[in-house]
Amino acid sequence: MRRGKFPGSLTDRQDVVVTLPLALPFKPMLAKLSRELPAGDGWSYEPKWDGFRCIVFRDGDGVELASRKERPFTRYFPELLDPLRASLPDRCVIDGEIVIPDREGRGLDFDALLQRIHPAESRVRRLASETPASFVAFDVLALGDDVVLERPFAERRSLLADAVRPTPPVYVTPASTSAAVAADWFGRFEGAGLDGVVAKRLDDPYVPDKRVMIKVKHERTADCVVAGYRIHKDGQGVGSLLLGLYDDSGGLQHVGVAAAFTRAFRTELLTELEPSTHDAVEGHPWQDWVEWQASNEPGRRPGNVSRWNAGKDLSWVPIRAERVAEVSFGQLEGGRFRHGVSFRRWRPDREPADCRYDQLDVADPVAFGDVIGAAAEGG
């Protein structure tokens, strides 16, 4: 029987010894990106939840939540602890996702989820009440003294369905062996803020830290104004481009960044954009952000300290807002692109003033409950 210690918990105790057969450090199984859903026999499909990946360790009254990167989540989501005790077996390890349903019934609210990672306990408690989270289970890793990683997914899915007593805010994700149902989910549930669809082979074991599953994500393109950039963390070249879209009032809204460039392209971008930095501050659409950065005053700005890494430099270099880039993105939420945005090409044939929100094709809202209710559909 493996014994281990949980890192930090809601009470900041470091001596919580677990008798589960699995303990931290533990890295979850991952998914590799595909442009098409795999078809044929032997596959199971699930909605791809857009939240925080979370491994739940329950040992009697002890419940600990661990992130994909093995960081403790427990103190940030105290409202989940009692529901998890009520819904999960006494001793188990469950893989799933923490999400926050929008209270107005428009799907998931990822921005509200981001706000939950905060160092002040008073704010943690307040947000737990104002924007309560849910947990969606989609795999089981251990039950009692048994590690079930080597068992095929079809068997693990059956164990999960029998083990979890779904009661809000704890759920079991819908699943189907029908590719037609999965294709329907892919299109229909985008409006709920879901990323796409995940496919798992019914005979696959659970392989920690390996890309065994298949994920198919939504992708669209947009023309955006490039209004600044950040230097790469190694100090060599451009690490990311700051993107903007004009709203109906004529304001240029910061909608995200394009990044993940090759080393050669980072250097090329720095050389190409350097002339655009000249006289860029005066009249810049984000001049107030530039001035805030120069004064180093605290506040929520593009140059603020990262919530995830206090040592991360988010300072940026303004350029004249004259360049247009075509980018690919997955989702738009709260007026901003979600997750990574990919640079495709420069568009010298486009005018910055034409880079508006109304060019975007946005999915109609779908309620969180409609997604959960899909479990009753074809299997």
What are these regions (language model features)?
Residues M1-G379:
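Catalytic cores of nucleic-acid ligases and guanylyltransferases
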